[in-house]
């Protein structure tokens, strides 16, 4: 499935995660704003197919591994609509986002985190060139409990297709 990435519009919000619910795990949600697409800050992009249909979205925020600006890198996430899953869309989208970061920013590393039970995302990240680094214990609150996850990364110097 050929895909492309584009900035959000207000029309996209109801189609994306949580768009149909005013609540999340913590209670009532704040009014959703259209996320920005600036690669140097927190942001997101919509994943679309050839005819412009929304397949899902990518988001990112920066994490810091040291005190200077050179020690920060984006942590990315992906969400796919059910009909887009299992078709290689997530792999293509995450690889495309990594390429954008390495072409347009000076980051050395892009990270991703996924639940230990999310085998599909683990496979997707591996196919996109990410390396598994280890378990992050009790890192994500979901479904009423803290859950373990796996941390993945890809470096600027890692081979990519």
Task: Report residues per predicted region.
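Acyl-donor (CoA/ACP) binding surface of acyl/acetyltransferases
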Residues: 1-23, 44, 48-161
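Active-site rim helix/loop that mediates acceptor-substrate recognition in acyltransferases
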Residues: 24-50
């Amino acid at each position: 499935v050929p895909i492309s990435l584009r900035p959000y519009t207000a029309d996209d919000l109801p189609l994306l995660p949580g768009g149909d619910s005013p609540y999340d795990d913590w209670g009532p949600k704040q009014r959703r704003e259209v996320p920005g697409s600036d690669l140097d800050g927190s942001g997101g992009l919509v994943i679309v197919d050839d005819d412009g249909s929304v397949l899902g979205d990518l988001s990112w925020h920066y994490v810091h591994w040291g005190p200077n600006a050179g020690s920060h890198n984006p942590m990315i996430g992906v969400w796919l609509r059910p009909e887009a899953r299992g078709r290689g869309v997530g792999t293509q989208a995450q690889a495309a986002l990594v390429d954008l970061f390495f072409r347009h920013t000076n980051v050395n590393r892009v990270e991703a985190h996924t639940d230990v039970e999310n085998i599909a995302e683990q496979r997707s990240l591996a196919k996109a060139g990410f390396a598994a680094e280890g378990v992050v214990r009790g890192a994500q609150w979901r479904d009423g409990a803290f859950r373990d996850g796996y941390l993945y990364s890809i470096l600027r110097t890692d081979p990519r297709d």
